[in-house]
């Protein structure tokens, strides 16, 4: 392949990357994407795109290197060839590790979560705000649990939406909002008193 062909391929790759970045950037806003308040609405999707671009770029380097090395392989390459592949792969993963040092998941207060242990710890912390009053003295949690099992598992089980409920609603203090939605469904059978009891149990125990 001559230099002219190489130049065309490089130009095609760069142009495709720019087009992909523009589409990614546009779609992120069309889907209603909103980053955390302390993050830039412009830089955040661009950084995500750069992560994918680096992954593809490093993979391309590996393929290019293997192609060039395969034409010069001899009996003396039995050790240097696999070592070269190992070095290229390690450079790729280290570069991605440095790029994503802050983590892929960001909380609303700007903190980063990198591991499942950190995510579990975050979910177990009590919410900063709540639209549900604290449980009164002598509150019967066992009876409340039975009420929740009867009223709140008609359309789907609570376990099937547990992660969504805990991360999107309970953590943001919107438990009562979900209870009111369930109460509004035809045939829910949830009275106002039931709604208060269910809300307290969901906030305290679920």
UniProtKB/Swiss-Prot annotation:
* Positions of transmembrane segments: 10-30, 49-69, 76-96
Does this entry carry the keyword Transferase?
Answer: no
Q: Tell me the residue numbers annotated for binding heme.
A: 152, 155-156, 182
Listed SUPFAM superfamilies: Cytochrome c
Q: Where in the cell is it found?
A: Cell inner membrane
What is the species listed in this Swiss-Prot or TrEMBL entry? Chlorobaculum tepidum (strain ATCC 49652 / DSM 12025 / NBRC 103806 / TLS)
Instruction: Give the GO biological process terms.
Output: photosynthesis
Q: What does this protein do?
A: Monoheme cytochrome which is the immediate electron donor to P840 of the photosynthetic reaction center complex.
Please state what the protein is called: Cytochrome c
Q: Mind telling me which GO cellular component terms the entry cites?
A: plasma membrane
């Amino acid at each position: 392949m001559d230099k002219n062909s190489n130049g065309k391929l490089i130009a095609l790759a760069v142009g495709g990357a720019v087009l992909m970045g523009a589409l990614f950037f546009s779609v992120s806003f069309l889907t209603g994407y909103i980053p955390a308040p302390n993050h830039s609405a412009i830089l955040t999707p661009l950084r995500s795109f750069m992560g994918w671009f680096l992954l593809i770029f490093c993979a391309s380097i590996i393929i290019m290197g293997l192609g060039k090395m395969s034409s010069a392989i001899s009996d003396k390459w039995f050790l240097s060839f696999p070592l070269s592949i190992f070095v290229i792969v390690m450079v790729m993963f280290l570069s991605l590790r440095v790029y994503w040092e802050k983590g892929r998941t960001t909380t609303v207060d700007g903190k980063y979560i990198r591991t499942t242990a950190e995510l579990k710890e975050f979910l177990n912390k009590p919410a900063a705000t709540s639209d549900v009053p604290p449980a009164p003295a002598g509150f019967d949690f066992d009876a409340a649990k039975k009420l929740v099992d009867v009223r709140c598992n008609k359309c789907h089980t609570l376990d099937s939406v547990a992660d969504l409920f805990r991360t999107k609603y309970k953590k943001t203090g919107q438990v009562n909002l979900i209870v009111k939605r369930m109460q509004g469904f035809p045939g829910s059978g949830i009275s106002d008193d039931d709604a208060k009891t269910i809300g307290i149990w969901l906030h305290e125990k679920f």
